[in-house]
Amino acid sequence: MKNHILNHLPYKSSFRFVDNISRLTEDEVIGDFTLKEDAFFYEDHFAGNPITPGVIITEIMAQIGLVVMGIFLILKDTELNFDEDNDLFPLLTSTDVSFFKMVLPGQKVTVVSKKQYFRFGKLKCYVEMLDSTGEVVAKGMFSGIIKQVDGLKK
């Protein structure tokens, strides 16, 4: 099921921030991503001393912590068989994130997300990002919806 979920992520390789999903239940998802040292956003942020932009940290947290879980819950709760012409499109509706540590190029991060609620198509999760030592890099609340979009091209 985890690989099936990853196949539904609507991102191409340069903006897909999910390497692995190690746990996936109705209430929790745990996944990781290793930031590539040659990622496009490091060249200018900050030149000569690159760090991962907060918007990228937020995006990693959203992709693993909200989108993966949302797709899982929708596929689990419906009898819909999504294919290339009937894809799922995630829409982030709100975030409230606090940052505690820098994330450097080449660093592996783990995202842990716990569902707060999923009703009427809206998912809300408490999401934490941890570094390789288990220290919290960022944490916050994420909300979003996932819609079916016919003919969405990847």
What is each stretch, according to the model?
Residues 66-112:
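Hydrophobic beta-strand-centered segment that forms part of the acyl-chain substrate-binding groove
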Residues 102-154:
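HotDog/MaoC-like acyl-thioester-processing domains
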Residues 10-57:
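Catalytic strand-loop segment that frames the active site of acyl-thioester-processing enzymes
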Residues 19, 96-97, 127:
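Hydrophobic/aromatic beta-strand elements that line small-molecule binding cavities or substrate pockets
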Residues 52, 57-69:
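Active-site- and interface-proximal helix/loop "cap" or "latch" segments in soluble metabolic
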Residues 1-12, 84:
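Short aromatic-glycine motifs in intrinsically disordered, low-complexity regions
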Residues 6, 48, 98-101:
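Beta-strand-rich interaction surfaces with strong enrichment in secreted/lumenal proteins
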